[in-house]
Every structure is written in C-alpha cells, then in structure tokens.
C-alpha cells in the first residue's frame, strides 16, 4: 500500500492502461473484472465510487466491477447505495462476513445487499473464504484467524444462508 500521496498522473495512466487491457481482452474473448479493495490492501481504488470513476475514465465496455463485502465493511456505510452506484458495470460480488467468515452472523447487512443486487445486472455471487491452515496462505495475506477450516462446510453454510435472499 502506498503510504504517500499518489503521483498526479497515476489515475490517467491507470485509465489508459486499463483501456488498452480492455481492448486486448475483448479481442481474446475475456472480460476484465476489477475489484476495489480496502485502504489496507491498495491505494488505487478503495470504494465502489473510486473504481467506477477509473472504469468510466478508461472508457471501455469490456471493463467491469466486482465488489467484495469484506472490503465494503471498511470503506462504505450504505451497502445498498454502494452496490447500486456501480450500475451496469457491476459484474459480481465476493460474499463473506466482515471477518472473511461464512455469510451470516456478522456485520454485513445481507438483506440490503441482496435487495440492491436484484436492482443490478450482477451475474455472479461467489463465496470467498480463506483456510489459514494451508501453509502460510493466510499469514501472507494478513489473515490470522482460520475462519474457513473446512471449505466444503463453508460453501454449504453460505449457500444455506444466502439461498432465501435470491429466490
């Protein structure tokens, strides 16, 4: 994470590079999906609004946005408004709790999240969990609690919790 003010030309250069990448990926039949990450992970785009500004400036139809509830908990207060603000650029959502655990029982306002997703063209919801018991996987990512010791159980619980929201 950059611990100083970014250079003035960073946003224009980022947008220009993303436009070129979007075109290259389009020719290859691949979508580019970008995820804003919390200020503790990146300085480039921390909020949905910041990522949307970069994508709009890059001005390529092949650039899309993926939001992550783990990063939203740090950067926004109104999840539904943040999700809706991305509009047609929203491709998907990484769903996990504020501690990266199974959805449900934490701080994420799931009814508001799924209500807002229904107002978008979101094509994908994936469950993101990390098993810190696998070598140094979690430690290298700053995840010190093993909130996902059993990936199969994580997915079963996540599906059971979220299924009522998507019907």
Q: Residue locations for each model-derived region?
A:
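Histidine-acidic metal/acid-base catalytic patches
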Residues: 45-67, 72-167
């Amino acid at each position: 994470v950059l611990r100083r003010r970014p250079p003035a030309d960073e946003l224009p250069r980022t947008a220009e590079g993303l436009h070129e990448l979007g075109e290259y990926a389009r020719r290859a039949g691949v979508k580019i999906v970008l995820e804003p990450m919390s200020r503790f992970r990146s300085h480039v785009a921390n909020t949905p609004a910041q990522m949307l500004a970069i994508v709009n400036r890059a001005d390529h139809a092949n650039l899309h946005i993926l939001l992550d509830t783990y990063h939203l908990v740090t950067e926004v207060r109104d999840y539904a408004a943040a999700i809706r603000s991305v509009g047609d650029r929203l491709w998907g959502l990484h769903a996990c709790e504020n501690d990266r655990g199974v959805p449900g029982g934490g701080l994420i306002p799931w009814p508001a999240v799924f209500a807002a997703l229904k107002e978008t063209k979101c094509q994908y919801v994936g469950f993101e969990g990390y098993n810190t018991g696998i070598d140094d996987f979690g430690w290298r990512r700053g995840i010190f609690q093993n909130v996902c010791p059993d990936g199969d159980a994580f997915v079963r619980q996540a599906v059971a919790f979220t299924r009522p929201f998507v019907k």
